[in-house]
Every structure is written in C-alpha cells, then in structure tokens.
C-alpha cells in the first residue's frame, strides 16, 4: 500500500512539473515574439528546417500533453493492475460463494481412518458419569477389564458435568489397567441454548412427569442432547477415531478374544451395536417428521444404500420406532463429525425437541447412521454378551457361546423378543435368522 501511494505521488509531481514548465515556456515565447525586430524575423527562414516560435510552443504543448498522458496511462496501468488483483479476489470469492455444495459423502469423512489398518486404532472407551455413580461404574470397569481391556488395552475417557472428586479419580485410576483421562463438560454443552423457552420447557416436564420414564427429568434431557451433539466434540476425544461407550451398571457376559477396534477398522465398519429396541412414541412425536424434512432439504446426505427399511415399514412415510440402544456403541467418531450429522443435529437442536419433547440420543444416532451410511457399514455384535438393565444380548450360536465362556442365559436374549427390533434389523440387512428365533416371539 505504501509503494502504491508513493508511485501516485511521483506521477502527480511529474504532471505538475510539466504543467509549470509549459506555462513558463509559453510566457517566455510570448515575450520573445513581442521583442524580436521584424528585420531579424525576416532574416530567418523558418521553412528550411528551423522551428518557428509558434511551432515551438505547439511542440512543447504537445510534449507536455504526451508527458501528462504518459503519466496518466502509467497511473491507469497501475490502477488497472490493482483493480485486476481486486477483481481476481472478488471473482474468487464469488466463485466460492456460487460453488456447488460440497459433494463429499459422509463416508468420505470416515474412510481416512480406515487407512490405519497396519497400525493400532486411535480408539478409547468413553463414559459420561456422575460422582455418585462410582459404585456402578466400578462394576462396569471390572467387566470390561476382565473380558477385554487387559488383553487389548485402550485409554479410557471419563466425562462429567461437574468436577470429579479425588475419591472418584483415585478409585477409577486404580481399577483401570490402561491410561485414564478425566474431563469436564463445557458449560454451554450442558445448558439451555438461547432459543429455548425455559418456562415452556419446565411446564412440559411437569406435565410429563407421570406420563413416561424420565418425563419430568431436566438432567436426562441435557444428557440426551449432550450425547447427541457434543460428546464427540470434547477436546479429550479429538485425537481418536473410534470409541466404545460404556455406562455404569452394565455387564459383559463373554470373553472377547479379539481387538474390536481393530476389527472395525480392518473391516471398514462404522457403527456397532448389541441391542435394538422400539422407542416410546410419546417421547418423540415430531422427531421423524423433522428428520424427513431435513432429508428433503439435503437429499445429498441420504446414502443410496441406506438402511431406511430398518426405520420405516413404508419407505419413510412413518417411523416404526426402531433404533439401536446407544448405551452400547462401538463407532467411528468421524460419523458425528461429518457435515451431514453436524447439520442434522443443528436442525434438531433448533427445533427444540430435546427440551419440549424428550428426544433421546439413541433414536437420533440411529436415524443418522441408518440414513447417512451404506447399510453394510453397520454391524450387530451378536457375539458380545451384554447386559444393560433390563435387557440381555446373549449369543445364540452355541459354538460362540461355549468358546467365549459366556455366562448369560440364552433364553433371556432380547434380540428377537417382541419389543426388540432384531427381526427388523435382520430383514433390512438380509441376514439369516437363527433357526430357533421364533420361540422368542412367543
């Protein structure tokens, strides 16, 4: 900018000087013509190569004009160069603004994590827990440690909306054989966004308190919103591609003799679950329509090989309430980090259903995974014996059951029971059901 101004000043000086010289010359020539005697004037032949005073004046005027025009041309040239640079910048900005929407699919944001097949997955266990849940958490840790983590250790991240007590941290650190990390949730991730009418939300909770489970709970709604849209943004998870969600009071019934994270990575799976179930419709009256409206506005996010048939029996017109139970998730964090999911969550969040209804993170995660991913990227861990009150996932395959020293009752397996969505999942994926699956429907 300084150089540009200096050049302008130089051009102005040159032009001003030329004008002054011209005026002085004209004045001088005028006086000269007045005082030249006619005899001297007649003695010179101005047509034989010499220049008359009048012609000299004209010549000097022309020279001054040329000098001025040259300076102006130079200024225009540099102005043009400056304009060109500005135009280029504006053009680039315009092109960027008019550019088509990013055509990357959700999988394009996930596949880079598959490239690490030769190395250990960037993975961790993650638990959102309160200090008062220490006893239940230690029970869960014991199962995870004995069934898998001692054989295939990974870091464990513990998150809380309040500071962990020293007692809590000491007990957990002692119980976990691998690295542990403790994190606090940012306040804005566990509070009301500015667009939520808190008076209205409180009235809805009061009315729902006796109508359905957690209907009157404020903290449960914050938890569902956090698990839906924020846990994967926590700074302690930034270095990881994979996570296994573990909650207090869960059980693992069988030995897990392989690295599940490595299996997910090598087989290019994105979302894994153990239990599928129907949601309480009264808690999510507008979730499906809101989701379908989002898909209509953003059809590019709907994967062509999606798992819509798991969610809907009429190609999306209505929701059959099926979802993956999110208290157990082994999944790729980049699914939630993708533009599709970020925009989807933002749409849901502004709709207000986490507070005005009681939208759970399980149906939110399930709808997104089933629609944004190719269906072959979703995996049912039928070999992992798992319990979260009150349901069990118990391997029905006898060989798997025996070889993994399973301790569960196969008769209690929830997969094909009436309230489960195991049948819907098997049908949607084209999987062959166990021979005795129908007995669980009785």
UniProtKB/Swiss-Prot annotation:
Gene: KRE2
GO cellular component: fungal-type vacuole membrane; Golgi apparatus; Golgi medial cisterna; Golgi membrane
Cytoplasmic side: 1-11
Compartments where located: Golgi apparatus membrane
Summary of the function given for this chain in its UniProt record: Mannosyltransferase that transfers an alpha-D-mannosyl residue from GDP-mannose into lipid-linked oligosaccharide, forming an alpha-(1->2)-D-mannosyl-D-mannose linkage. Required for the attachment of the third mannose residue of O-linked saccharides.
Transmembrane segments: 12-30
Biased composition (Basic and acidic residues): 85-95
UniProt topology in membrane: Single-pass type II membrane protein
Entry keyword NAD: no
Stretch list, region Disordered: 68-95
Cofactors that this protein relies on: Mn(2+)
Positions glycosylated per UniProt: 197
Name of the protein: Glycolipid 2-alpha-mannosyltransferase
Region (Stem region): 31-118
Further information: Present with 13000 molecules/cell in log phase SD medium.
GO molecular function, one term: alpha-1,2-mannosyltransferase activity
Species this protein is from: Saccharomyces cerevisiae (strain ATCC 204508 / S288c) (Baker's yeast)
EC number: 2.4.1.-
Coiled coil: none
Residues annotated as the enzyme's active site: 329
Keywords: Glycoprotein, Glycosyltransferase, Golgi apparatus, Manganese, Membrane, Signal-anchor, Transferase, Transmembrane, Transmembrane helix
Location of the region described as Catalytic in the Swiss-Prot/TrEMBL record: 119-442
């Amino acid at each position: 900018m300084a150089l540009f101004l200096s050049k302008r000043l130089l051009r102005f000086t040159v032009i001003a000087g030329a004008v002054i010289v011209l005026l002085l010359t004209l004045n001088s020539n005028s006086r000269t013509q007045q005082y030249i005697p006619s005899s001297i004037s007649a003695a010179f032949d101005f047509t034989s190569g010499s220049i008359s005073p009048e012609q000299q004046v004209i010549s000097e005027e022309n020279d001054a004009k040329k000098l001025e025009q040259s300076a102006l041309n130079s200024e225009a040239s540099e102005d043009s160069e400056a304009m060109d640079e500005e135009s280029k910048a504006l053009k680039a900005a315009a092109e960027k603004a008019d550019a088509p929407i990013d055509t990357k699919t959700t999988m394009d944001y996930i596949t880079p994590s598959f490239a690490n097949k030769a190395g250990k997955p960037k993975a961790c266990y993650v638990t959102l827990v309160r200090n008062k849940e220490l006893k239940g958490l230690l029970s869960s840790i014991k199962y995870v440690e004995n069934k898998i983590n001692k054989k295939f250790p990974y870091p464990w991240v513990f998150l809380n909306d309040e500071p962990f007590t020293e007692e809590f941290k000491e007990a957990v650190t002692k119980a976990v054989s691998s690295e542990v990390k403790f994190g606090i949730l940012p306040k804005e991730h566990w509070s009301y966004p500015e667009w939520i009418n808190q008076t209205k939300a409180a009235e809805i909770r009061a009315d729902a308190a006796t109508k359905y489970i957690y209907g009157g709970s404020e903290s449960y709604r914050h938890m569902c919103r956090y698990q839906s849209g924020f846990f994967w943004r926590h700074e302690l998870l930034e270095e990881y591609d994979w996570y296994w969600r573990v909650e207090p009071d869960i059980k693992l019934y069988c030995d897990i003799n392989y690295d599940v994270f490595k299996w997910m990575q090598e087989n290019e799976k994105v979302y894994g679950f153990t239990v599928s179930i129907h949601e309480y419709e009264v808690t999510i009256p507008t979730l499906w329509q809101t989701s379908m409206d989002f898909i209509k506005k953003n059809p590019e996010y709907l994967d062509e090989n999606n798992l819509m048939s798991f969610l809907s029996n009429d190609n999306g017109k209505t929701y059959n309430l099926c979802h993956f139970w999110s208290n157990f998730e082994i999944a790729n964090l980049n699914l939630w980090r993708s533009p599709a999911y970020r925009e989807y969550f933002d749409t849901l969040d502004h709709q207000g259903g986490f507070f005005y209804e009681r939208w759970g993170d399980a149906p939110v995660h399930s709808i997104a995974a089933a629609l944004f991913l190719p269906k072959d990227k979703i995996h049912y861990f039928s070999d992992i014996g798992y319990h979260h009150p009150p349901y069990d996932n118990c391997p029905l395959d006898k060989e798997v059951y025996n070889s993994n020293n399973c301790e569960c009752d196969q008769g209690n397996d929830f997969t094909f029971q009436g309230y489960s969505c195991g049948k819907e999942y098997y049908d949607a994926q084209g999987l062959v059901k166990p021979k005795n699956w129908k007995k669980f429907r009785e």
